[in-house]
Amino acid sequence: MDEFGGSFENRMRLPKLIIENIRKKAGDSLAILCRINATDDVEGGQTAQDAAAVASYLEKECGVDGLHLSRAVHLHDECMWAPSLIHGGFSADYVTEIKRAVSVPIITVGRYTEPQYAELMVAEGRADLVAFGRQSIADPEMPNK
C-alpha cells in the first residue's frame, strides 16, 4: 500500500494535494467545489456517515467552498445512473445527513424533474442548490418554471 491508500488520512491525501494546488494557483477569488458520492448503496461500500466525514474533512482541512453531492446507483450492474422509475430527490435523506456535518453550501442532484421538489429541498434547508443535469437537456425551460 502506498501513501494514498488504507487509512482515512491517506485516502484524503490526493484530494487535499489537488485542492491545495488549485488554491495556490487560483487564490481566494475562485470558489473551489468538490463533487462527492453521498452513498454507494452496496454492502461494504461508502455510507452517508463516511461521506459526512469526507465532507467535513474537505471543508475543515482542505478549505473547499462548497460540495456537490451525487449518489452511486448500483441497483444492477447494467445501471450506472438512476432509472426512470426512481423518484426525484432519491438522495434527499443522505444529502440532509451530510449537510448537517458541514457549513459550506451543498448542491444536490438526482432526478429532479419537477421544480416543486427542488424548491422544497432548498426551502427545508436540506440543500442550498439543486443541479439539473439531464433534466436541463430534456427541458431547457426547467429553470424558468
Enumerate the predicted regions with their spans.
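Flavin-dependent oxidoreductase catalytic cores
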Residues: 1-145
